[in-house]
Amino acid sequence: MSQVFNFSAGPAMIFPEVLQKAQNELINWLNQGVSVMEVSHRGKYFMELVTQAEKDLREVYNIPDNYRTLFLQGGARGQFATIPMNLIGKKGKALYLNSGHWSATAAKEARNFAEIDEITIVENGEQTRITDLDFSHIADQYDYVHYCPNETISGVEIFDVPNVGNAVLVADMSSNILSRQIDISKFGVIYAGAQKNLGPAGITLVIIRDDLIGNARKETPSIWNYATQRDADSMINTPPTFAWYLCSLVFKHLKEIGGLEIIEKRNALKAQTLYDYIDSSKLYRNVVAKENRSTMNVTFITGNPELDAKFVAESTAAGLQALKGHKVLGGMRASIYNAMSQNGVEALISFMKKFETENLPQ
């Protein structure tokens, strides 16, 4: 079978080295004669895995000692409700910065639990761009300020951290977590579904500052209560052990290849290579301002929906999978998360050049 490159927005590709290791020990994990999927989540070997996974994650992401890591379920959508249930306090309201589909969806869910103010920070003119990120003059009115630093659908990324003064900043990093080095101390809570850069779907990572745990409203279900999950080591219920195991392999692999310093350089090169070609092309166009172009999700169009559909069909046949844009926006989208290689990007560009030659209007 010829090589296939998977540009899916999520669940996304996982490092081949990680998948190979998982395959090698699938039915005989740690020479126990059983799969990791078959052992007790509270047994000696799995608890050692959990401890090592957290240690590796903390090292790779440089997580401060006064932050806890929780491995939960429910995806980012679950956190859309969990955040207000745990963080709304005396001020009784939160501020949501709307940069696109997912930040708007988070705000809509949060309104079921609290008073939510929403400010649009994206301009959709000839080019899509992020506006002012200084909210220090109003942030202290709110229990927290929420934003999504990478919008997968539109391919918009916010590289600067919003200025919220001393307010609690909450970030949905589902699509750019572990893609570059960040200062975690600037955030109160970071959360992310696993299925883009952490591992397979099923695990939701929450990184939360210690002082923000223990303030949940009394009717919060125990499974969504950060304090309960902290005290139970994220095991108030039986966790998705295989997903946790694969995440542990990803963290270890990131360490082995040099950490986020290396990953950040690789990601920047992949994205720049693809954007440079799109900008030089006479057929394709990206509508996001250069300073806000996503490193993870590269969107592009031909300007002709029928030609877009033809591109998707022919690229799929050529072994370039999942390039169809989100139904909300259309066009094409190449998701080039951590596990995507430079070779994959070069293969995509090679196909794009061929398609342009064959389909550019005369």
UniProtKB/Swiss-Prot annotation:
<dbReference type="InterPro" id="IPR020578">
    <property type="entry name" value="Aminotrans_V_PyrdxlP_BS"/>
</dbReference>
<keyword id="KW-0808">Transferase</keyword>
<keyword id="KW-0032">Aminotransferase</keyword>
<protein>
    <recommendedName>
        <fullName>Phosphoserine aminotransferase</fullName>
        <ecNumber>2.6.1.52</ecNumber>
    </recommendedName>
</protein>
<dbReference type="InterPro" id="IPR015422">
    <property type="entry name" value="PyrdxlP-dep_Trfase_small"/>
</dbReference>
<feature type="binding site">
    <location>
        <position position="195"/>
    </location>
    <ligand>
        <name>pyridoxal 5'-phosphate</name>
    </ligand>
</feature>
<dbReference type="GO" id="GO:0008615">
    <property type="term" value="P:pyridoxine biosynthetic process"/>
</dbReference>
<comment type="pathway">
    <text>Amino-acid biosynthesis; L-serine biosynthesis; L-serine from 3-phospho-D-glycerate: step 2/3.</text>
</comment>
<feature type="binding site">
    <location>
        <position position="42"/>
    </location>
    <ligand>
        <name>L-glutamate</name>
    </ligand>
</feature>
<keyword id="KW-0663">Pyridoxal phosphate</keyword>
<keyword id="KW-0664">Pyridoxine biosynthesis</keyword>
<keyword id="KW-0028">Amino-acid biosynthesis</keyword>
<feature type="binding site">
    <location>
        <position position="172"/>
    </location>
    <ligand>
        <name>pyridoxal 5'-phosphate</name>
    </ligand>
</feature>
<feature type="binding site">
    <location>
        <begin position="76"/>
        <end position="77"/>
    </location>
    <ligand>
        <name>pyridoxal 5'-phosphate</name>
    </ligand>
</feature>
<dbReference type="GO" id="GO:0006564">
    <property type="term" value="P:L-serine biosynthetic process"/>
</dbReference>
<feature type="binding site">
    <location>
        <begin position="237"/>
        <end position="238"/>
    </location>
    <ligand>
        <name>pyridoxal 5'-phosphate</name>
    </ligand>
</feature>
<dbReference type="InterPro" id="IPR015421">
    <property type="entry name" value="PyrdxlP-dep_Trfase_major"/>
</dbReference>
<dbReference type="GO" id="GO:0030170">
    <property type="term" value="F:pyridoxal phosphate binding"/>
</dbReference>
<feature type="binding site">
    <location>
        <position position="152"/>
    </location>
    <ligand>
        <name>pyridoxal 5'-phosphate</name>
    </ligand>
</feature>
<dbReference type="Pfam" id="PF00266">
    <property type="entry name" value="Aminotran_5"/>
</dbReference>
<comment type="similarity">
    <text>Belongs to the class-V pyridoxal-phosphate-dependent aminotransferase family. SerC subfamily.</text>
</comment>
<dbReference type="InterPro" id="IPR022278">
    <property type="entry name" value="Pser_aminoTfrase"/>
</dbReference>
<comment type="function">
    <text>Catalyzes the reversible conversion of 3-phosphohydroxypyruvate to phosphoserine and of 3-hydroxy-2-oxo-4-phosphonooxybutanoate to phosphohydroxythreonine.</text>
</comment>
<dbReference type="InterPro" id="IPR000192">
    <property type="entry name" value="Aminotrans_V_dom"/>
</dbReference>
<feature type="binding site">
    <location>
        <position position="102"/>
    </location>
    <ligand>
        <name>pyridoxal 5'-phosphate</name>
    </ligand>
</feature>
<keyword id="KW-0718">Serine biosynthesis</keyword>
<feature type="modified residue" description="N6-(pyridoxal phosphate)lysine">
    <location>
        <position position="196"/>
    </location>
</feature>
<comment type="subunit">
    <text>Homodimer.</text>
</comment>
<dbReference type="GO" id="GO:0004648">
    <property type="term" value="F:O-phospho-L-serine:2-oxoglutarate aminotransferase activity"/>
</dbReference>
<comment type="pathway">
    <text>Cofactor biosynthesis; pyridoxine 5'-phosphate biosynthesis; pyridoxine 5'-phosphate from D-erythrose 4-phosphate: step 3/5.</text>
</comment>
<keyword id="KW-0963">Cytoplasm</keyword>
<dbReference type="GO" id="GO:0005737">
    <property type="term" value="C:cytoplasm"/>
</dbReference>
<dbReference type="InterPro" id="IPR015424">
    <property type="entry name" value="PyrdxlP-dep_Trfase"/>
</dbReference>
